[in-house]
UniProtKB/Swiss-Prot annotation:
Catalytic reaction equation(s): RNA(n) + a ribonucleoside 5'-triphosphate = RNA(n+1) + diphosphate
Family per similarity comment: Belongs to the RNA polymerase subunit omega family.
Native species: Anaplasma marginale (strain Florida)
Role noted for this protein: Promotes RNA polymerase assembly. Latches the N- and C-terminal regions of the beta' subunit thereby facilitating its interaction with the beta and alpha subunits.
Keywords (A to Z) from UniProt: DNA-directed RNA polymerase, Nucleotidyltransferase, Transcription, Transferase
Transmembrane region(s): none
Classification lineage: Bacteria, Pseudomonadati, Pseudomonadota, Alphaproteobacteria, Rickettsiales
Gene Ontology biological-process annotations: DNA-templated transcription
Listed name of the protein: DNA-directed RNA polymerase subunit omega
Length: 128
């Protein structure tokens, strides 16, 4: 974002991550056929979503809740798929090779790198 653009998004107090999550969720809704709250003017869904957010045309708490629910669903599917893959690999392959890092979580590999996103805070709806 350019220096002069900060006034447009003043309601986010510098939390660009939350803005991206909201715009992404709203663009996803628009792609799924939701009606726009502003004139489209030939803009793409991402631009329309940002214009709706800037124009305060949406219930942002509801949009954020939908984004959190969508993320939870994705994580559940990902976790289930990972468990199935782990079960299959444990049946077909030897237990583990020396130095193998497959199966280690992101936090186990580098705990400091994962500190930028507190998962519990995100899922509780607390963006700040």
């Amino acid at each position: 974002m350019r220096e002069g653009d900060s006034g447009y998004f003043s309601c986010y107090d510098g939390n660009r991550f939350r803005l991206v999550i909201l715009a992404s969720q709203r663009a996803h809704e628009l792609s799924s056929g939701a009606c726009t709250a502003v004139a489209r003017k030939g803009d793409k869904n991402t631009v329309v979503a940002l214009r709706e957010i800037v124009g305060e045309q949406l219930d942002l708490a509801a949009v954020f809740k939908l984004a959190v629910n969508r993320c939870r669903k994705y994580l559940e599917e990902f976790t289930n798929a990972r468990e199935v893959a782990a079960a299959r690999s444990s049946q077909a392959a030897p237990k583990s090779a020396p130095g193998q890092e497959i199966g280690k979580s992101f936090r186990e590999k580098d705990p400091s790198a994962a500190a930028f996103l507190d998962q519990e805070q995100f899922f509780s709806g607390g963006g700040e």
